[in-house]
């Protein structure tokens, strides 16, 4: 046998040595049966030798190794000495060291197993007698690890409570354990017993021991090979998984939040209320191994695996709080143990794994002379590498750090780090080959090339199965030739798949970014072609003969939604003629109108609808659009067909329509209904929209005069009698009313035109009451008297009706009996007028007496005012020398001053300074003018030639100057500043001239 190559297992393919590798133990993984890796890719698994800084005084072979949270603990042994070393892998610091020889050699013990808790601070070492004659019973050591800036401290203690029990498995408690205490943990023994205990450095000699369950049922040899404590996320349900060589058990129970002990989990099973879930597998192995995989930094495992006599069983863990099953899945990786039954012990040893670890997609198995990795998904071997025992030593076991995911393989001489590089790289291909397309798509999502392969194969499979709609969806996501895919679907009678495929391709094009103008032009051409084709496909389905209304309605709805998409609208607007021609070829007037609406061509829509005599649809189209010009254009025709709905629509538009543009289109009125609706809109425009346009008012006035005289009078009254405020042409209105003989309105208008005589004369022809009201309207009493005389003449002349004359005297106080007498025929007796004449005389007498009384009161008031003025001339106020100005508070007598009757005193300049801002603009201008004139007079008198003035001229100048000063004082001192001016301005606005303020701000 070639000594350069270690023995190769019989049922595994030989892996050729790669002589060009960087190390002596480097092998090519691609030749091991992984068809997906290329030589250019990094290997999924690669072995690298680790260099541990072992102290020089520590020698011997590596016996056991455990790793957790980057803490690596190993045992080195020689016949004379056994040493425990504890390394912190991220930093090159001296390891912690503990010599265990005093616990071993002198007592006849040997170490069988070593367990490390998840924190890396608690170590359990199982001890058994070296031989049956050693005279000792199984035991275990507990080592607590502490760190300080200077060194690590490893405290070793023998746990006497567990004598006679060989510890074969430990379930640490990650939920209650910490660096200072393990919390409640479970210990499994070689006889199938499960104990609960809690270890910490402070409990010297006081370790509690509780037996929770017996799987061995008294058998002397029933080792527990695996023990794991789990808690379902977001719940208080605990799960315990236990394995023996041929069975795997699960226990579960919900604990109280404050409960620490794990005894309650087994209580129901001990009492017989329930049985543990057990799965038994036939085996010829004397051991089994339980492993879990959790992603780095995860608290709950994702997968489990059990190495047993059948092979490796793999599955997932349930995370449902109420799930009865815990271990889900029953995938078996067959290791062909049965084929090794006829082999020799040495050959069987080479083909039986010593240990394994679990990654997310692989199981990594350690054999006596090699390590290999098997994919969990397809059970293909993806990696194998042999050990040169002469060089690196005999392989012992393999471990995985649950925190970091790092894998460590160790022999008696060396520790290797088995690196895992992108182990998921080929998962997509495996799922694809198995037809699990959802999973294949998910794992290929990050690689566009792989994703395209998955989608293409998935689409082909769906098409082959007749799932054409599904196939269309996936083809649309691929880069497969558009023409090729379309040819596949065009032969199908159902056009739904090809329509959806083209729509999805259109969606991809419209969302795909373009970088250059040239590409933009190409993109627009592609979009145009796809949109036009889709429109054609839709119209074919909509207008398919021999199809029911439900079919057409369904396709029509989908077509309408498609046409309203933003990119479709944009494309059809740019190519409106092409689309219009296509729709015309399908002879589809409804969709032609819908298309015109979609692109905003409402003019064409309304024209087509009117042409087809679809007046209601045309009106609705007008209502739905926003262009007022179309109302002006089509309202005349619509109001002849649909008067009321058209006016309702016009009124609903409100101020959006210009009444001045609209009304001229409504002049043609062929029947009463049209006239009434036109009148209704004019009333709306005037009373609701408050239009002031003369033409609108004149139009409505003409309609009223011709058809509704009563409404005309109401309109005129609303407009009022102030000719400057009315919005109609008074002269036009007068002419219309004259032509149409609307007398009452004509009287109203003649009053506004101040044609009082003609108004009264006209009113006398049909309404005496109106004539009297008209005669009473002028403000000039002379005109009123004249008008009442005309009424009297009309009422009395020729009738000699004294009673009417007397009534007129009562109605108008401007008329006297002597004014009416000429209207009567000659008479000799005045008996009929006696009472009226006497009343007139009494009235004259009363008025004379009132005038005399008023004259007496006026004389009396004049005398009283004269007396008061005389008293004021003699009134005086005393000014003290210490009096001060009310404004500046300085001595009053130092400057000219004013003193008011209220007692307030002001310097003249102080008063002027505060009064001027309160004056009106006119007063300010007048004050400035007076001051300039006064200054000019003073300068004139001061000139040298003024000495030559005569005495009369000098007196004239002095008088003029005094008059100016008096007028200035009348402005400034007209009222006390405090008692008059400031009080009178309290309700005045701060700003008088807002227009000026706005100009200044601009």
Swiss-Prot record:
A zinc finger (RING-type) spans 885-924. GO terms for molecular function: protein-macromolecule adaptor activity; ubiquitin protein ligase activity; zinc ion binding. Disruption phenotype: Flies display impaired deposition of pigment granules. Member of the 'granule group' of eye color genes as mutants affect deposition in pigment granules of two types of pigments, the ommochromes and drosopterins. RNAi-mediated knockdown results in late endosome fragmentation and mislocalization of Vps8. RNAi-mediated knockdown causes impaired autophagosome clearance in fat body cells of starved or wandering 3rd instar (L3) larvae. Conditional RNAi-mediated knock-down in muscle cells disrupts transverse-tubule (T-tubule) and myofibril remodeling in internal oblique muscles during metamorphosis. GO terms for cellular component: autophagosome membrane; CORVET complex; early endosome; endosome; HOPS complex; late endosome membrane; lysosomal membrane; lysosome. It holds the Pfam family Pep3_Vps18. It is a peripheral membrane protein. This is Vacuolar protein sorting-associated protein 18 homolog. It comes from Drosophila melanogaster (Fruit fly).
């Amino acid at each position: 046998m070639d000594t350069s190559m270690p023995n190769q297992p019989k049922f595994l393919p030989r892996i050729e040595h790669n002589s060009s590798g960087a190390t002596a133990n480097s092998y090519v993984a691609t030749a091991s049966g992984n068809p997906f890796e290329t030589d250019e890719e990094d290997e999924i698994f690669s072995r690298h030798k680790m260099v541990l800084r072992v102290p020089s005084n520590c020698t011997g072979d590596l016996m056991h190794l455990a790793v957790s949270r980057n803490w690596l603990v190993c045992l080195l042994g020689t016949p004379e000495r056994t040493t425990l070393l504890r390394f912190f892998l991220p930093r090159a610091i001296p390891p912690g060291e503990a010599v265990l020889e005093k616990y071993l050699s002198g007592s006849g013990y040997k170490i069988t197993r070593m367990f490390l808790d998840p924190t890396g601070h608690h170590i359990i070492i199982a001890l058994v007698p070296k031989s049956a004659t050693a005279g000792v019973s199984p035991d275990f050591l507990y080592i607590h690890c502490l760190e300080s800036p200077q060194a690590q401290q490893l405290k070793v203690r023998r746990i006497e409570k567990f004598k006679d029990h060989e510890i074969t498995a430990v379930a640490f408690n990650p939920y209650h354990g910490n660096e200072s205490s393990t919390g409640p943990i479970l210990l499994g023994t070689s006889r199938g017993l499960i104990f609960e205990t809690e270890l910490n450095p402070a409990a010297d000699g006081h370790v509690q021991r509780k037996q929770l369950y017996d799987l061995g049922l008294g058998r002397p040899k029933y080792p527990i090979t695996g023990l794991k404590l789990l808690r379902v996320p977001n719940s208080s349900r605990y799960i315990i998984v236990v394995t023996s060589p041929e069975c795997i058990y699960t226990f579960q129970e919900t604990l109280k939040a404050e409960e620490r002990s794990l005894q309650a989990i087994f209580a129901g099973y001990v009492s017989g209320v329930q049985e543990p879930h057990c799965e038994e597998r036939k085996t010829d192995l004397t051991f089994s191994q339980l492993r879990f995989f959790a992603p780095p930094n995860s608290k709950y495992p994702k997968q489990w695996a059990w190495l047993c006599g059948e092979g490796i069983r793999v599955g997932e863990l349930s995370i449902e709080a109420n799930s009865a099953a815990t271990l889900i899945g029953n995938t078996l990786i067959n290791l062909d143990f049965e084929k090794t039954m006829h082999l020799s012990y040495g050959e069987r040893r080479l083909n039986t794994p010593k240990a394994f670890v679990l990654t997310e997609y692989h199981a990594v198995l350690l054999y006596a002379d090699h390590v290999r990795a098997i994919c969990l998904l397809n059970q293909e071997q993806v990696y194998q590498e042999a050990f040169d025992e002469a060089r690196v030593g005999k392989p012992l076991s393999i471990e995985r750090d649950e925190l970091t995911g790092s894998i460590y393989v160790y022999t008696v001489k060396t520790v290797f780090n088995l690196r895992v590089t992108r182990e998921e790289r080929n998962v997509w291909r495996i799922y694809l080959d198995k037809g699990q397309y959802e999973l294949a798509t998910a794992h290929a999502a990050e690689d566009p090339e792989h994703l395209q392969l998955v989608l293409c194969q998935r689409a082909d499979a769906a098409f082959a199965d007749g799932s054409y709609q599904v196939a269309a969806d996936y083809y649309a996501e691929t880069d497969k030739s558009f023409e090729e895919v379309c040819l596949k679907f065009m032969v199908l009678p159902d056009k739904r798949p090809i329509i959806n495929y083209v729509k999805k391709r259109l969606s991809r094009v419209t969302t795909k970014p373009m970088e250059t103008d040239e590409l933009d032009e190409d993109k627009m051409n592609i979009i145009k072609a796809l949109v036009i084709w889709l429109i054609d496909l839709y119209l074919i389905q909509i207008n398919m003969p021999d199809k029911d209304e439900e079919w057409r309605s369904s396709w029509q709805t989908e077509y309408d939604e498609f046409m309203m998409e933003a990119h479709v609208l944009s494309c059809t607007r740019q190519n409106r003629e092409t689309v219009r021609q296509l729709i015309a070829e399908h002879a589809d007037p409804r969709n032609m109108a819908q298309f015109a609406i979609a692109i905003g061509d409402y003019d064409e829509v309304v024209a087509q609808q009117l042409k087809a005599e679809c007046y209601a649809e045309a009106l609705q189209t007008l209502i739905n659009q926003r262009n007022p010009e179309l109302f002006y254009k089509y309202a005349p025709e619509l109001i002849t067909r649909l008067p009321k709905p058209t006016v309702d629509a016009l009124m609903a538009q409100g101020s959006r329509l210009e009444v001045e543009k609209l009304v001229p289109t409504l002049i043609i009125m062929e029947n009463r209904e049209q006239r009434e609706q036109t009148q209704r809109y004019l009333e709306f425009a005037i009373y609701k929209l408050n239009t002031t346009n003369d033409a609108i008012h004149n139009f409505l006035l003409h309609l009223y005069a011709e058809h509704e005289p009563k409404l005309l009078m109401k309109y005129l009254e609303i407009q009022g009698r102030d000719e400057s405020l009315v919005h109609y042409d008074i002269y036009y209105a007068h002419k219309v009313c004259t032509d149409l003989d609307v007398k009452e309105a004509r009287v109203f208008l003649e009053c506004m035109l101040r044609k009082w005589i003609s108004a009264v004369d006209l009113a006398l022809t049909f309404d005496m009451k109106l004539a009297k009201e008209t005669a009473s309207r002028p403000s000039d009493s002379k005109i009123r008297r004249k008008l009442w005389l005309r009424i009297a003449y009309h009422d009395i002349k020729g009738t000699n009706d004294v009673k009417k004359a007397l009534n007129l005297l009562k109605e108008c106080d401007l008329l006297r009996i002597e004014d009416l007498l000429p209207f009567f025929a000659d008479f000799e007796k005045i008996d009929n007028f006696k009472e009226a004449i006497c009343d007139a005389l009494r009235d004259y007498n009363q008025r004379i007496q009132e005038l005399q009384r008023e004259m007496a009161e006026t004389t009396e008031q004049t005398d009283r005012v004269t007396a008061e003025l005389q008293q004021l001339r003699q009134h005086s106020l005393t000014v003290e020398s210490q009096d001060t100005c009310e404004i500046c508070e300085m001595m009053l007598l130092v400057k000219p001053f004013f003193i008011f009757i209220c007692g307030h005193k002001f310097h003249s300049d102080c008063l002027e300074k505060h009064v001027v801002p309160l004056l009106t603009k006119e007063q300010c201008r007048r004050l400035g003018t007076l001051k300039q004139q006064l200054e000019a007079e003073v300068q004139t008198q001061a000139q040298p030639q003024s000495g030559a003035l005569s005495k009369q001229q000098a007196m004239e100048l002095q008088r003029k100057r005094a008059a100016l000063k008096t007028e200035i004082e009348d402005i400034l001192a007209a009222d006390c500043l405090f008692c008059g001016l400031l009080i009178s301005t309290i309700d005045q606005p701060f700003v008088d001239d807002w227009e000026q303020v706005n100009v200044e701000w601009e």
